[in-house]
A protein has these predicted regions:
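Short amphipathic alpha-helical coupling segments at ligand-binding clamshell hinges
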Residues: 42-46, 221-222, 310-322, 420
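Hinge/lid segment of periplasmic solute-binding proteins
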Residues: 88-141, 283-285
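C-terminal lobe and pocket-closing loops
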Residues: 269-279, 292-297, 305-401
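Short helix-initiation/N-cap motifs at beta->coil->alpha
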Residues: 63-71, 89, 162-169, 239-253
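Short helices/loops that flank or line small-molecule/ion binding pockets
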Residues: 69-80, 97, 149-150, 169-178, ...
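Conserved C-terminal helix/tail region of periplasmic/extracytoplasmic solute-binding proteins
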Residues: 374-438
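Conserved N-terminal structural module of periplasmic/extracytoplasmic solute-binding proteins
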Residues: 2-93, 110, 245, 326-330, ...
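Glycine-centered hinge/linker elements that transmit conformational signals in sensory
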Residues: 172, 211-244
Length: 438
């Protein structure tokens, strides 16, 4: 396997700031993590399973968000953490740079059946046909439709779809509300730039991969269609300003107040609605491509072992334990029980492992009379098997910045879609050239 350059000048400059490992004098039984936190029972229960099975290990969970530059600097300095928890969309980049180790021997030692993992999450942790990480949660994107608002416009919520792009402008006009020229209701939020991979895929294009180009006419069309939908709703400045007023995580959210008719959204938001607005009247359906086929992308994090990890064997034990179906079921039960004690609903647990999900949704999940979860959770579970993922790239972070920046320029009226995506492609090519890949 050809390893791409790991250490840039900027990383060398900060490498002396200190690493993230256990320190040379630490006991051999220490295990230091990076990028992982303990926010709820999904984390704490699984960590407890590992601690019980490995009482001799001094597990040090360094809570906090993953910092890419800090991680690469620590690897360059020869002082990395033992195990890292990072966005799996970027793991291919770290593998290409030689910053993480292949897990073939680790997975074989623990008899981990990769066939249990769904294709999309697994593809993101695979580089040159070798697996460099084990994926964890799997968040999807679904359409959440505000039934009263849509019915008020004389439409059937169940029939609302993203299949016919030529019909979307008229749909937006019908659902959007202005008062004295001021936006009062968003008819349809296309969620760009962040959901551009979904719109591009719906048009038959990927944003990364050997044959992908950001200036592909199909990508340009996706940018044009979605940004024009925003323009029809007052333009980006007023659209975003109005959206920023939403009580997204409260009882007076945009579905409860009628400030939004429909949008694609991350599946985790169903839990928010189920908790804060359990009686809100919504329909949850798949996003569809231009042929009418259900379409969604899977995102989440993965565990990996950095190059230079002092305790790769223990790190392997930790990863295998944290991602085992039995451990997931234990965590799901703990999460369900903690939420029940607080008077809150449990919206299921969705992982990259189909065996774990099947058990959780058979043994643990029960929507009760919560309407949001009753219809939303089965939709998400059914979509998991057919999700796609943005292909891994040696320059994943740079590509993300390139296409998001391009869409933002169009939204702000600085460039037209063709010109902006052409610039994004040039930026992507420079980034790929810097890391020596495609």
């Amino acid at each position: 396997m050809r390893v791409l350059p790991l250490i840039s000048a900027s990383l060398l400059a900060v490498a002396g700031c200190g690493g993230l490992g256990d320190r040379p004098g630490d006991a051999p039984n220490a295990l230091a993590t990076m990028g992982f936190g303990l926010p709820d029972e999904h984390a704490t229960a699984r960590v407890e399973v590992f601690r019980r099975g490995h009482p001799d290990i001094d597990l040090r969970v360094n809570e906090g968000a993953f910092d890419e530059q800090q991680f690469l600097s620590a690897v360059a300095a020869g002082d990395p953490p033992d195990v890292v928890y990072a966005e799996r969309s970027k793991l291919g980049s770290y593998a290409a740079r030689g910053a993480v180790q292949p897990l073939d021997d680790c997975l074989d030692r623990h008899d981990v059946d990769l066939g249990q993992f769904r294709e999309a999450p697994l593809s993101q942790v695979t580089h040159d046909d070798r697996v460099y990480g084990v994926p964890e949660f799997s968040t999807l994107r679904v359409m959440i439709i505000n039934n009263p608002v849509v019915r008020e416009a004389g439409l059937d919520p169940a029939a609302l779809a993203t299949t016919d792009w030529s019909a979307l402008p008229a749909l937006v006009d019908r659902l959007t509300r202005f008062d004295g020229g001021k936006l009062q209701r968003i008819g349809f939020d296309p969620k760009v730039p962040e959901f551009l991979p979904l719109w591009a895929k719906a048009n038959g294009a990927d944003l990364a991969g050997p044959d992908a180009r950001l200036d592909d006419p199909r990508v340009v069309e996706a940018v044009r269609v979605t940004t024009e939908l925003v323009d029809r709703q007052g333009g980006w400045a007023s659209f975003k300003a109005f959206r920023d007023t939403f009580d997204q995580f409260g009882a007076n959210n945009h579905y409860a107040t009628g400030q939004l008719a429909a949008m694609p959204m991350d599946s985790w938001y169903l839990n928010t609605l189920a908790t804060n607005s359990p009686d809100v009247d919504v329909t949850v359906v798949p996003f569809t491509d231009r042929r009418g086929n259900p379409l969604t992308d899977s995102s989440g994090s993965a565990w990996a072992i950095p190059k230079g990890s002092r305790h790769p064997g223990t790190a392997c034990d930790f990863i295998a334990t944290m991602t085992a179906p039995d451990t997931w079921v234990t965590a799901a039960k703990a999460r369900r029980d903690a939420l029940a004690a607080a008077g809150k609903p449990y919206g299921g647990t969705f992982t990259a492992n189909r065996v774990a999900d099947e058990r959780i949704h058979r043994e643990v999940f029960d929507p009760g009379d919560n309407r949001v979860l009753g219809q939303g959770v089965p939709t998400v579970l059914a979509l998991q098997e057919n999700a796609f993922a943005v292909p891994p790239s040696p320059a994943a972070s740079e590509l993300l910045r390139a296409w998001e920046g391009a869409v933002n320029r169009v939204l702000n009226g600085q460039q037209d879609p063709r010109e902006s995506m052409a610039q994004a492609q040039r930026e992507a090519e420079r980034a790929l050239k810097r890391v020596g890949g495609r």
